Amino acid sequence: MSGLDWNTFLAILRAGLWEQELRLPSEPDAAGWERLLALSRSQAVMGLILKGIAQLPAEQQPPEEIRPVLRTMEEAFARANARYARVQGGLLSLLTDAGLHPVVQKGSEAAKYYADPSARQVGDIDIFLPDGEFQRARALFPDARIASDGAVVLVQDKVTIELHPRYYDIHRPARRLPAPGSPCGEILLLTAHIFKHVIGHGLGCKQLCDMAVSLARLEGKYDKKALRAALQYAGLMRWHRLLCSLLVADFGLDPACCLTGFQPVDPERLRRIVRESGHFSHHAKTKAATAGAFLRRLPFSLSYCPRETLATVRELALGNLLTRGK
C-alpha cells in the first residue's frame, strides 16, 4: 500500500467521521478505489468510508465499475448492524429481566458519540456486570467458555459476546479509579482498551475513531485534572499522550480536546503499527498468533506502559494455567 493510498484513505475517513465535505487533490482510479475499499475492511471502518465517499463532489465519486462493490458493502454492512442490534437487544433484555444491571462498555458504548452511530462498524458486545452480579450472569450461560482474563465468552448469531467481571482492564484497585460509565471513566477505559489491542491482536482505525469521537463529544464534560491523575495512577500517561498525538495528526481531533497543556509527540511508531496490523478480526486469533504479536511488540509496550504490560503477562500466564487445568 502506497503512502498516497493511505493518505487518501485517511482523508475520506475523516470526512465520514466528522461529516465534513471533502474534495480530494486527485481522485483514485478503479484499482485505487478497490485498494481503498479493501483497506476500509481490514481497518473495520467500512461505514465511515461509505459516509466519507458521500461527502465527495459528484465528479469525484467512484467510477461506475466500482458501484456494484459499494452496493455489496452497503448491504453487508446493514445486515451486520441489524444482526448486532438484535443480539445486543436480546442480551440486555435477558440480563435485566434476571434483575441484573448490565453496563455496555468499550466500542459498543463509544458508538453513541458518533454523529451517526449506525456508521460505526459493529464487532464484539462487551458488557460489565457490577459487584455481585457477574456470577449470576455467568450462570445464565453454562456452556460459555471462560477467557484467561476471567471474562465469559459466547457467540450468538455470529456475534461474540463478552461478559466482564471488572469495568477496567487495568491492574489497579478499582476503588481508586473513576466511576464506571462516567465521562472520565469512559476515556480511561478506552485508553487502556486500545493499548491492549496494540500489544495483542492488533489495532485498527476503528478503535482510534472511537477514541477520537469520545474525546470530542466529552470535551468540557469531565475534569481533566482528574483524568490526568487517573492516567498517572494507572501508568498510562505516556501512552495516552502518544495516542492523542496520532489522533490529532491523522484523525482530525482538535488538540483542545486533549489534556490541558497537551504537547504532541511523533506518532510514527504507532502509525506504523496501525498500518501494518489493522483490526484484529482480520487476522488469526489463535493463542500462538496472539503470543507472537505480543512478543514482537514487547519493546514498544514496555517503553510506554511497563507496569501494565508486565501485569498483563502475569495475568495471561496465570489464566492460561487455570483454564488448562479445568
Predicted ranges, named:
Residues 1-123, 129-326:
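Conserved NTP-donor binding/palm subdomain of two-metal-ion nucleotidyltransferases/polymerases, i.e.
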